[in-house]
Curated annotation (Swiss-Prot):
Biochemical pathway: Bacterial outer membrane biogenesis; enterobacterial common antigen biosynthesis
Protein name: TDP-N-acetylfucosamine:lipid II N-acetylfucosaminyltransferase
GO biological process: enterobacterial common antigen biosynthetic process; fucosylation
Gene that encodes it: wecF
Originating species: Escherichia fergusonii (strain ATCC 35469 / DSM 13698 / CCUG 18766 / IAM 14443 / JCM 21226 / LMG 7866 / NBRC 102419 / NCTC 12128 / CDC 0568-73)
Lineage: superkingdom: Bacteria
A GO molecular-function annotation: fucosyltransferase activity
């Protein structure tokens, strides 16, 4: 039998490491279809830390795509599971027949679905990608992204699946002991990536709350981002007093990041697409409500799980935030579908579908 090959076709270290470690620690022991990987990027100790996996690394998108296409042509029974598909050459291969629909299964990460880049080459590529997406064997995504995708590709099969956020289920019932009164602390964005639109988000927070709240902006990832970090810092200082603005330029380890999140009262995410699900999960777990752009379809997943959702277009004040905190405290977090370990069932089903084990 030909085993399923998983493809991480772009060098996105943080997300790629999360996926590899999840497969190594959780899925590989029980499924032979959870062990073979082709990855763009450097080893950086991943092979040693993921002994249950067979991982082949490639220096760039082009070399990986060529290897995938060669395997696909050599054996039409070979199936591939693409995790976050940011590799144009692979889309073109699907469109041209180099990879067949029955070989192509795609877990949507959010940024790979939306057409937000305004550059000429992207505008030329997006129509071709849309045509290729009609040929995908099956897509796996959040409820909101499935709904978004189905509007333009109603005939493509879609299955619910959540990114494997690193979570400790024992923290679901831990009461957040932060004082829910006085000056609020607001987390702005989930990383230093420009897609967070930090400057616009800071202006929106200031418009809602003025200089009465403390704003925390985590920007330690991605690396080599100093110029943009300084741009955000200066924009923040034009709006907030120095004691009310904390721009973090160093990457935080997981436990330190968790501690930071638990010091917040509200998460504020202005981006108009699904992203940052890991940060959203950790905030919700800590009883901290989130403000989303109404164009971000993840609100559908949150309401499906009976979670309070605030929108950037709402008139926000402290009373509304405190009420959302109270509502969130009443939710049984052990039942939330996109929390660990509840998302495991979706992953087991996704593997079976992509491998052809179930119809």
């Amino acid at each position: 039998m030909t085993v399923l090959i998983h493809v991480l076709g772009s060098d996105i270290p943080h997300h790629n490491q999360t996926v590899l470690r999840f497969f190594n620690d959780v899925l590989a022991a029980t499924s032979e279809n959870a062990r073979e990987f082709m990855v763009v990027g450097k080893d950086d100790g991943l092979i040693d830390s993921c002994p249950a996996l067979s991982v082949q690394f490639f220096p760039g998108k082009k070399s990986l795509a060529e290897a995938v296409i060669a395997k696909a042509k050599a054996n039409r029974q070979q199936r591939f599971f693409f995790h976050g598909q940011f590799n144009p050459k692979l889309w073109l291969a699907l469109l041209s027949g180099g990879i067949k629909p029955s070989q192509f299964y795609w877990h949507i990460w959010g940024a790979d679905l939306y057409e937000l880049s305004s550059g000429l080459r992207y505008k030329l590529f997006y129509p071709l990608r849309r045509l290729a997406q009609k040929r995908v064997g099956c897509v796996f995504a959040t409820r909101g992204d499935l709904s978004f995708f189905a509007k333009t590709h109603p005939k493509v099969r879609g299955e619910l699946l959540y990114f494997p956020t690193r979570m400790d289920p024992s923290l679901n019932t831990m009461a957040n002991d932060r004082q829910r009164e006085g000056k609020m602390t607001i987390l702005v964005g989930n990383s230093g990536d420009r897609s967070n639109e930090h400057v616009a988000a800071l202006r929106a927070v200031h418009q809602q709350f003025g200089d009465t709240v403390k704003v925390v902006v985590p920007m330690g990832y991605p690396p080599n981002n100093e110029a943009y970090i300084e741009e955000v810092r200066q924009a923040g200082l034009a709006l907030f007093s120095e004691e009310n603005l904390q721009v973090l330029s160093e990457k935080l380890e997981f436990d330190a990041y968790l501690t930071l999140l638990r010091q917040c009262d509200l998460g504020y995410f202005i981006f108009a697409r699904q992203q940052g699900i890991g940060t959203l999960c950790l905030l919700i777990q800590a009883g901290i409500p989130c403000v989303l752009n109404r164009e971000n379809p993840f609100w559908q997943d949150m309401t499906e799980q009976h979670l309070p959702v605030l929108f950037t277009t709402d008139d926000l004040n402290e009373d509304i935030v405190r009420e959302a905190q109270r509502q969130l405290a009443s939710v049984d977090k052990n039942t939330i579908a996109f929390f660990s370990p509840n998302y495991l069932q979706g992953w087991q089903r996704a593997l079976a579908i992509a491998a052809g084990e179930v119809a």
